[in-house]
Amino acid sequence: MRTFVLRARAAPTNSRALLEGVGNEAHTEILAHTLMNTMFVAQSHRQDVVVHLVLESTKDFSRTITIHSNEVSNVGGFHEANLLNIVVRALDASTGMGKEELRNVEPGVTVRTISFERLVQQLAENHQLYMLEKKGEFVRDIKFAANPCFLLTDHIPMPKKTFNSLKRLGTQNISLGPKMLFASQCVTLIQNELDLQE
C-alpha cells in the first residue's frame, strides 16, 4: 500500500470557502491536482493507494479526508471540479463533528476531525514515513520500505517544531532534486520511483 499525506495548511474546512479558494491565496486546487496524480494514470486508476488530505484553516478542528483508491467509485469524471467535489462532500458531511470523530462519506471516502500530528503518529505505527526535504537523501539512492507513507505540504512550509516530532517517529528525509516542486508534481515523481522499484 502506498500512502500520501498532504498537509494543506491554507485550505479551509468550510466547503464554500474551499471552492472560493481555487486560484486564490489558499490555492485549494492543489487538493485536486494531488488527488489526480496520486490515484490516476492514463486510462485507469492506481490500486492500493491511500491519500489523506489534512485541511487546517478552521475555527474548530482540522479535517482529514481519506480516499482509498481501491474503493472510491463516485468520482464522476476526471477533472479538477469533480475531484474537488469529493472534498466538498466530505467537508459537508463533517459539519457538527466533535474532536477525533470519524464519518463515512461515500465508498472509499471518510472524514475525521484529527490533526496532522495525530494522524502521522497513527501512521508511524505501521508505515515507514518519508518527508520531502531538499537536503534529504536522493530518491534514486533509496530502497523504499514495503509500506511507505509520504508527507507533503501545500505552499506553506511545515512548522519547525513538526520536523522534531517527525524525527522522533523515524521519518526519513528524501529529496527529489534541486528544484522546489508542487506537491502534485512530487507525488508523480514518487509514484514513478516506486513503479521502477517494483
Swiss-Prot record:
Pfam families membership: Methyltrn_RNA_2
UniProtKB keywords: Cytoplasm, Methyltransferase, S-adenosyl-L-methionine, Transferase
Any one Gene Ontology cellular component term annotated for this protein: cytoplasm
InterPro entries: Alpha/beta_knot_MTases (IPR029028), TrmY (IPR007158), tRNA_m1G_MTases_N (IPR029026)
Residues where S-adenosyl-L-methionine binds: L132, C186
Subcellular location per the Swiss-Prot or TrEMBL entry: Cytoplasm
Xref: PANTHER family: TRNA (PSEUDOURIDINE(54)-N(1))-METHYLTRANSFERASE
GO molecular function, one term: tRNA methyltransferase activity
EC numbers on record: 2.1.1.-
Domain of life per record: Bacteria
Uppermost EC category: transferase
Single Gene Ontology BP annotation: tRNA methylation
Similarity annotation: Belongs to the methyltransferase superfamily. TrmY family.
Name of the protein in question: Putative pseudouridine methyltransferase
Gene3D superfamilies linked to this entry: 3.40.1280.10
